[in-house]
């Protein structure tokens, strides 16, 4: 739909003489009443005597109206219309209406109003109602086929007329014999009487057959009633095996309930087992990772202790000789304990491979017996360093930590 189509349609309808004013806003929304009036008026312009019902109240009437208009325009004006767009009765229907109005408008422009009136008068001379003539057309076709068949049979009979004429002439010319005529009449009467007797016998047989059928029907009814009563009796009587059947059914139901319960328990336990295996696998992986971390930290701590031990030995050589034994002991003894405390604080709650008890016990003894002998303290300190080096590297027992020689020299100084 476009503004140009709406404008052309309104101008063409005004030029064709449509009595009602059509605004361009009328067809922007669905307006089936206006579209039906325009279609009926355009059809009247083509064929004033056409008979199309104008009822558009119900949906069925509107569909029939649109189909009739489309059929008329296709047969009369050879214009193919889109019934779906016409039924929408909005801007899309304007394009379909323009197909009709453009033909009328062009005819009016070429020949003028007078020429168009003359053409309409000429067309009215040969008007016909297609809807009312369809039945006549079917009847004419049937009569034409009958005429053909009857004409063929009549032609055959006329071909036999020569022989039949001679036979007819001989029969008419031959005199009638009373005795022979009576004989023929009697034979015919006997045949008729025989047929009548046969018909009476058939009627009697029909009556007897009817009686027999009624008797059979009555007998069947009695049997049906007797069987129905027997069925009711059987239904009212409880079978002897019904108690056992019900008991067996209850037992089966109990067994089925037990089976369901056990099956559910089995399924639950299998699920728990799978969960347990999964958790064990996770724990194993976690322990493995933890062990790797501990080993790495122990290696780092071992390296750090070696570096710190070498640094401490160099510091002892630089110190002056007038330092007291107590000050030297306070610098040297807490260093291994500090390294072990750092290691224990790094992995709280985890199991350490190896033993750390030797160093701790020796430190305690050194703290208690620090006033007895300085040389014993130095020897205990050497033992502590060896024990700590062994405990820090449990995975590599063949690797030994070499004690730095400056420590012995520093001890000898004292």
Curated annotation (Swiss-Prot):
Where is this chain compositionally biased, Acidic residues type? 312-328, 360-389
What are its GO cellular component terms?
Answer: cilium; intraciliary transport particle B; microtubule organizing center; nucleus
* InterPro entries cross-referenced by the UniProt entry: Clusterin-associated_protein-1
Which cell locations does it reside in? Answer: Cell projection, Cilium; Nucleus
Keyword flag Phosphoprotein: yes
Q: Which family does it belong to?
A: Belongs to the CLUAP1 family.
Function of the molecule: Required for cilia biogenesis. Appears to function within the multiple intraflagellar transport complex B (IFT-B). Key regulator of hedgehog signaling.
Instruction: Describe the subunit structure.
Output: Interacts with CLU/clusterin. Interacts with UBXN10; the interaction is direct.
Q: What is this protein called?
A: Clusterin-associated protein 1
């Amino acid at each position: 739909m476009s503004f140009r189509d709406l404008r052309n349609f309104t101008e063409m309808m005004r030029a064709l003489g449509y009595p009602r004013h059509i605004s361009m806003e009328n067809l922007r929304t669905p307006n089936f009443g206006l579209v039906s009036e325009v279609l009926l008026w355009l059809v009247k312009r083509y064929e004033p005597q056409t008979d199309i019902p104008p009822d558009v109240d119900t949906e069925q009437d509107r569909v029939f109206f649109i189909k009739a208009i489309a059929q008329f325009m296709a047969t009369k004006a050879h214009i193919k219309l889109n019934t779906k767009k016409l039924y929408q009765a909005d801007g899309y229907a304007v394009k379909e209406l323009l197909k009709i109005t453009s033909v009328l408008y062009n005819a009016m422009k070429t020949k003028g109003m007078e020429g168009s009136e003359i053409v309409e008068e000429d067309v009215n001379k040969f008007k016909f109602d297609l809807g009312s003539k369809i039945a006549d057309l079917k009847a004419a076709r049937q009569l034409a086929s009958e005429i053909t068949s009857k004409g063929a049979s009549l032609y055959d009979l006329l071909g036999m007329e020569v022989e039949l004429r001679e036979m007819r002439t001989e029969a008419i010319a031959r005199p009638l014999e009373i005795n022979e005529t009576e004989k023929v009449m009697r034979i015919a009467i006997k045949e008729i009487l025989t047929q009548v007797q046969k018909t009476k016998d058939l009627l009697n047989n029909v009556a007897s057959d009817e009686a027999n059928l009624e008797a059979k029907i009555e007998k069947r009814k009695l049997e049906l009633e007797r069987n129905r009563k027997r069925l009711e009796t059987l239904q009212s009587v409880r079978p002897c095996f019904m108690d056992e059947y019900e008991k067996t059914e209850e037992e089966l139901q109990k067994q089925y309930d037990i089976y369901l319960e056990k099956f559910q328990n089995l399924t639950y336990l299998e699920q728990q087992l799978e969960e347990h295996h999964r958790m064990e696998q996770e724990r194993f992986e976690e322990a493995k990772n933890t062990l790797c971390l501990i080993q790495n930290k122990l290696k780092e701590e071992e390296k750090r202790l070696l570096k710190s031990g070498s640094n401490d030995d160099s510091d002892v050589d630089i110190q002056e000789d007038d330092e007291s034994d107590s000050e030297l002991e306070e610098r040297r003894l807490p260093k291994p304990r500090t390294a072990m405390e750092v290691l224990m604080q790094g992995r709280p709650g985890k199991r350490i491979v190896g033993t750390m008890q030797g160093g701790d016990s020796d430190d305690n003894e050194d703290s208690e017996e620090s006033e007895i002998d300085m040389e014993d303290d130095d020897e205990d300190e050497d033992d502590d360093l060896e024990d700590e080096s062994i405990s820090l590297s449990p995975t590599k027992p063949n690797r030994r930590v070499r004690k730095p020689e400056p420590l012995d020299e520093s001890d000898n100084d004292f």
